[in-house]
């Protein structure tokens, strides 16, 4: 089942290290990334057009912007390590890129937790064609 979840998330287009990001999201929100966030709104799971639908979707927009600031890194493939201390995610200091990718993923997981009250099931599996126009600048 876990392998199926990982493959499904990867195919849908979640960026970053799928395993680590997925664990962070589960730990912070209590929600499984698939299906909760893999195609939520206009920015969670890809797409990246139009305006974020709510604060949850905005978390994914900001996450995409964070990755955009790492042009010399490979956030889709670089795996990193982190641990939790006193309920907080601590990114390990392996390489500069891996640490910065981890910090981007940590930020989105915390943002999703802080905005759980805005999560709206009507934006799960939101049709990408409804996301029109250029996104705002990061």
From Swiss-Prot:
Predominant cellular place of this UniProt entry's protein: secreted
Extract the coiled-coil ranges from the record: none
- What are the subcellular locations of this protein? Secreted
* UniProt cross-references to CDD domains, sorted A to Z: PLA2c
Which cysteines pair up through disulfides? They are 42-131, 44-60, 59-111, 65-138, 66-104, 73-97, 91-102
Where expressed (tissue)? Expressed by the venom gland.
| Classification via SUPFAM superfamilies | Phospholipase A2, PLA2
Which region ranges are annotated with the description Important for membrane-damaging activities in eukaryotes and bacteria?
121-133
Any GO BP annotation: negative regulation of T cell proliferation
The family line of this record is: Belongs to the phospholipase A2 family. Group II subfamily. S49 sub-subfamily.
Instruction: State the protein's purpose.
Output: Snake venom phospholipase A2 homolog that lacks enzymatic activity. Shows high myotoxin activities and displays edema-inducing activities. Has cytotoxic activities against HUVEC cells (LC(50)=5.0 uL) and human lung adenocarcinoma A549 cells (LC(50)=5.2 uL).
Q: What is the additional note?
A: Negative results: does not show antimicrobial activity against E.coli and S.aureus and does not produce appreciable hemolysis on human erythrocytes.
Protein name from the UniProt record: Phospholipase A2 homolog
């Amino acid at each position: 089942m876990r392998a199926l979840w990982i493959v499904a998330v990867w195919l849908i287009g979640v960026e970053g290290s799928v395993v680590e990001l997925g664990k962070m999201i589960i730990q912070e929100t209590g929600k499984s990334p698939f299906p909760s966030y893999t195609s939520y709104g206009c920015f969670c799971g890809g797409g990246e057009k139009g305006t974020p639908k709510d604060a949850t979707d905005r978390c994914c927009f900001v996450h995409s912007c964070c990755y955009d600031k790492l042009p010399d890194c490979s956030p889709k493939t670089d795996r990193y390590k982190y641990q939790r201390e006193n309920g907080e995610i601590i990114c390990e200091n392996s390489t500069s890129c891996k640490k910065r990718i981890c910090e981007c993923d940590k930020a989105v997981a915390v943002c999703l937790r802080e905005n759980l009250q805005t999560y709206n099931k009507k934006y799960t599996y939101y049709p990408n064609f409804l996301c029109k126009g250029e996104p705002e600048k990061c």
